[in-house]
Swiss-Prot record:
Keywords: Plasmid. It comes from the Bacteria. Pfam families: Relaxase (PF03432). This protein is probably required for relaxation complex formation and plasmid mobilization by conjugative plasmids. Residues 220-330 are annotated as: Disordered. Residues 237-269, 279-330 have a biased composition (Basic and acidic residues). Disulfide bonds: none annotated. This is Protein rlx.
Amino acid sequence: MATTKISSTKSTSRAINYAEKRAEEKSALNCDIDYAKSSFKATREMYGKTDGNEGHVVIQSFKPNEVTPEQCNQLGLELAEKIAPNHQVAVYTHNDTDHVHNHIVINSIDLETGKKFNNNKKALHDIRQANDEICVSHNLSIPEEKAKLRYTQAEYSVLNKGKTSWKDEIRHAIDQSQAASYEELGNDLQQNGIKIERITDKTITYRHLEEDKKVRGKKLGEDYDKGGLEIGFNRQNEQREEQARQRELEQARREKIKRDKEREKEWARFNRSTQAIRQNRERSEREERERERKARELEEQNRRAREERARQERENKHTHEKTRGFDLEL
């Protein structure tokens, strides 16, 4: 029986240090196991992806006495090849607890695309499915109570041949859908040649149109029955509500920016208007002062002219009187 879980890590170096310290077996994919830390770092730097999560750690555990450490490590490497074929992966096997288990450290960068490994619900689903397929191919048990997928022996036979069953096509179509209701799910499935045949209070039945075969959701696994679907619908609705809220916040932010810019423009227009008024007033005051100065100068000139005329008149009068007195003496 093999179980898996996945977590993200901010430091692959710390994850490797911890895993390597107690490793009984170790192996690697797309890198040298003895230089895994430096290889991981060099790849992230080459693609400029040095922020955020540096990698992910998958814990693959087996029940006691089911596999040897050597077998466990080989199964871990096989899982790595299935779930992260284009990533650098280091596999470390521990045997210091009651069950042997692997620490599978995955570098975040895809060597071909440069994109990061997407650790989400689908990734966990794919890891568990791949792990189940590996266990079946090696005649190992699967924890039925924890299995998200339910395969028949016929499906396992198809999987072992490297083919995809019609039931897996239904699972894949449901996994790809982002529906938030049965109506939306039905529309998505219809585009993939699958029909929701029947929905009751407790069950849902699908039909694969090309194969003309039906199957109940619970036969596919708990994620595909009504309970699992409705959990997914609720999660999708919550995501949509959150996205709508974020859009509203973004719209409000943009409107505020727009209002602030308009306010800045209004203040700029007001400042320009105020400046123009001040400049006009100052110009008027200068012109008024200039007129007053010229008026004073003109008044001063007139005063001096009057004084000059008065002086001339006095001199003329004095001269006339002197001339008259001289004439009388003669």
